Each structure stands twice: as C-alpha cells, then as structure tokens.
Regions:
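Conserved hydrophobic/aromatic beta-strand scaffold that supports enzyme active sites
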Residues: 28, 115-117, 182-184, 205-206
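N-terminal amphipathic, basic helical "cap/leader" segment at the start of enzyme domains
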Residues: 1-111, 217-231
Length: 231
C-alpha cells in the first residue's frame, strides 16, 4: 500500500510519498542518457515546467535542512550578456584569437534553449561540508531527472568557465561558493547511443567481518585507471 502523509501549505493540500511502485520510473532510470549540448534544440521548458524542475531539484535528502545550494537561470533574454562575459573571460587567457572566433565559440557554449547553473553554497554550520556537497550533488541529479521526466534532454557540465574568476564574479559568488554545474536543457534533436557502463557486480560488496574481503569498487576503479592509461 502506498504510504503518504498529508501536509498543508498556504492554499493547497499535498501528499508526500515514501514509496511508490513504478516500473516506468525504474525503466527510465536504467536507460537515461545525457544529450550532447550541440544536440539540444528548441523548444525548451516553459516557465511552469522550469518551476517544476527547480522544485524537484530542491527536494532532496538534506542533513540539517541546510539547503546548501541555489540556482541561476540563463534565458534567451539575458543569454547575449552572458555570452559576452564568456568572451571577455576567454580574451583574458587568449589574446591572440580574433573576436569573431571567440564569439562563435561562446555562442556554441550558450546554444541550448535553457541554461541553469547550480551554485554550491555550504553553510557555516555544524553539518560537515562534505555532507552538504553530497546534498548539492543530489540536487543536481534531481534537476537532470526532472527535466528528463518532462521530455527534455539535458547535459550537466562544469568545464573551464565554472572555475573562471571572471565568470564567478559575474555570477555574484562568495568565496565559499562554487558552480556545481551548468545544466543545458532542450529538446533532444538526436539521442546518442549508450556509453560503457560498469557491471554493478564489479561495484558491489556484501559486507563480511572477514578482513580479506575484496573491495570490488576499488578493484573496478584500478582496472579502469589501467585501461585509461593504456589508451
């Protein structure tokens, strides 16, 4: 039986869900795929859909109710201004490339119909910072899943501009804050094939008091590192 709890908020009654059998949701989680930014086309989410996406993103496990994140939305109305910030940032590091090429490069970065950035903003409280970072990561993944659930493709990226001081200043970040990612959202013009995924058995260990227990997750990582170095 579905376990729910009724809660009152201003003018509406909502039900929280502790568990709900959904083969459709499980199938989606087992097959979801990020879409390259260049393949994201119009239309993007409507304002009501964006609100739903952000509400879903903010509904995460959060030790201490810190809410250690906030969102910045870049829409068509202010995309040109943000592009100029990227151009200026690129000029700082590369004063030899012409303006036309920089504008083209910045335009490609901003090509998705909707862009949302997630700001990690850990509170100076008793909750360990790394636990707050995990909460931010959960919010990021919820944002991706919510946009997917509304029928949109998403690409979650950081890239160089998440760490650029010019961009940080333009995003009005404080010293303790960081950009957890830019989320490029739109209709998937083309869905890519799946990438290599680890077998879950390689990542799973059933605990035992035996000290010789193999750390399967670590073993998989070591194997992957060797494979990557051999390329």
């Amino acid at each position: 039986m579905l376990k729910t709890s009724e809660t009152n908020s201003e003018n509406k009654k909502d039900q929280t869900i502790a568990g709900h059998h959904s083969s459709e949701l499980l199938h989606y989680l087992l097959h979801r795929r990020s879409v390259p930014r260049k393949n994201l086309i119009e239309p993007g989410p409507t304002e009501p859909e964006l609100k739903q996406i952000l509400e879903a993103a903010s509904r995460v496990s959060d030790h201490g109710k810190m809410v250690p994140f906030w969102f910045t939305v870049i829409t068509e109305n202010n995309k040109d201004e943000f592009e100029q910030i990227l151009i200026n940032a690129m000029k700082t590091d590369d004063d030899k490339t012409g303006d036309d090429k920089l504008e083209k490069k910045a335009g490609k970065l901003m090509s998705a119909p909707l862009i949302v950035s997630m700001i990690s903003s850990p509170r100076r409280e008793s909750i360990p910072a790394w636990e707050q970072f995990m909460c931010v990561g959960a919010a990021c993944q919820n944002l991706v899943l919510a946009a997917n659930a509304l029928g949109y493709g998403v690409n979650w990226l950081t890239e160089w501009y998440s760490y650029d001081e010019n961009v940080r200043q333009a995003m009005h970040l404080e010293d303790h804050e960081n950009i957890a990612g830019f989320f490029f959202i739109g209709t998937a013009g083309e869905v890519p094939e799946d990438r290599d995924r680890p077998e879950v058995e390689e990542l799973t260990t059933f605990w035992s008091p035996d000290s010789s227990l193999v750390k399967k997750g670590q073993k998989y990582i070591e194997k992957k590192d060797k494979k990557d170095k051999g390329r």
